[in-house]
């Protein structure tokens, strides 16, 4: 499952594998799991914040840039299976690729270990990481999204 989570579509295309062998479906699932867990986290951490502000804050927390930051902290790029062309053009460091891989990893953790393990991973390596590095945007910054 982990190998599937780090397999980019460029690698699958280059190796003439089935499209389903890349991480895109796991990314889809991981995105949904991340949205649910981050929503729950914000709901309980910001009990007086109105719904619109919670939505903006969540969007800023799970955006490509924030997830890419967390992926860099985990050195996720070094584990990616990329096609030669994608690798040669800096794909390991591209925010869109690393953030997608992080969502795929969340999807894999959810499928393999269940909701509780996915939640533990997200709290430890994404939500707490973002708080510790001041990436949680204020409502003014979220308005700019």
Regions found by a protein language model. Give the residues of each.
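Double-stranded RNA-binding/processing signature
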Residues: 1-140
């Amino acid at each position: 499952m982990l190998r599937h989570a780090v397999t980019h579509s460029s690698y699958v295309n280059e190796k003439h594998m089935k499209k389903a062998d890349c991480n895109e479906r796991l990314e889809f699932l991981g995105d949904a799991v991340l949205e649910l867990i981050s929503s729950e986290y914000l709901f309980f951490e910001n009990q007086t914040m109105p719904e619109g502000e919670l939505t903006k804050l969540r969007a800023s927390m799970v955006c490509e840039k924030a997830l890419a930051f967390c992926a860099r902290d985990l050195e996720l790029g070094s584990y990616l299976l990329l096609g030669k062309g994608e690798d040669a053009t800096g794909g390991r460091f591209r925010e869109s690729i690393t953030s997608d891989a992080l969502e795929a990893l969340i999807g894999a953790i959810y499928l393999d270990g269940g909701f509780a393990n996915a939640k533990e991973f997200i709290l430890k390596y994404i939500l707490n990481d973002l708080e510790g590095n001041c990436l949680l945007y204020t409502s003014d910054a979220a308005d700019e999204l």
